[in-house]
Curated annotation (Swiss-Prot):
It comes from Chlorobium phaeobacteroides (strain DSM 266 / SMG 266 / 2430). This is Peptide chain release factor 1. GO terms for cellular component: cytoplasm. Belongs to the prokaryotic/mitochondrial release factor family. Signal peptide: none annotated. The modification N5-methylglutamine is found at residue 234. HAMAP family: Rel_fac_1 (MF_00093). GO terms for molecular function: translation release factor activity, codon specific.
Amino acid sequence: MFDKLQAIKEKHEDLEQQLLDPHAAEDQNRFRKLNKEYRDLCSIVEAYDRYALAKKQLEESRLLLKNEKEQDMRAMVQDEISSLQESILEREKQLKLLLLPKDEVDSRNVIIEIRAGTGGEEAALFAADLVRMYQRFAEQQGWKYEVLDFNESSVPGGFREIVLGVSGHDVYGTMKYESGVHRVQRVPDTETQGRIHTSAASVAVLPEAEEVDVEIRKDDLRFDTYRSGGKGGQNVNKVETAVRITHQPSGIVVACQEERSQLQNKERAMKMLRAKLYDRQLAEQQEKRAGLRRSMVTTGDRSAKIRTYNYPQSRVTDHRIGFTSHALPQIMQGDIKDIIEALKMHDQAERLQAELV
């Protein structure tokens, strides 16, 4: 493991020198690739440096203990040694987690589909709440997001369905844990008796696919156009700019109405279709893989209830790992980093255990 870590450190230093080269930015594609590779190694190198520092401090403390005669000082140094030994074990565990092979699709951008489930109008409003939560989280991460398609509900501000595109660094690796059924318990504004209602919305996070990832035959597609209800300016409800694509072999249907031109909507809809087909392809590959590790946090079962948002008790519970937070208002404003980090650590621990078996 330590030979590998030293090689990573040397690679990190080499990449840093390449990025500092005044001519590096002349080739933007190469520069972006180098910068991404450099960022991906930073966390490993920083953890390795902390580990190496603790090892050095341990050696110095042991030497000090060997030469120290005063009992009080020896006891103090022994306490320091015990503390450093615990720290080294913890940092070694962290390094093992960081060295686990990454899912190759973790760096992809994503398409997030949010659909209102059981609960009628309240479910549609909750779907809108989840949209805002993810938009605020994307802003905090420095990601970009856009609405690709939506279907508003009869209640103002609600969505029966909405599709977001999110782009940035390590988006799928972060957001993949959000797929599943999210449940809300609260008193609706229209509830006169003060009774708590339970509603739900489903979330599907799909890695964005490149054209080379999936083969789509033109003959397999059916294109329909219709009048847009989106931001089409004077074209809204006058020109058929919205596009619906049906992939006939799979039955998958995608639609986009957000852009002003039919061509732009078609391009976006094709991006959504590629993501859906790629997601299905990945799921099939996982099922066929021998000895597939069944993870609690990334089961791929989007019908599984993963989280409950209890408004009366200001509590959010993730049922996959038993994570509980009483900071519901902050979470609904996009502060979901602690939940995602807990899920990520649990997933990594499962993977590490599988590696050791």
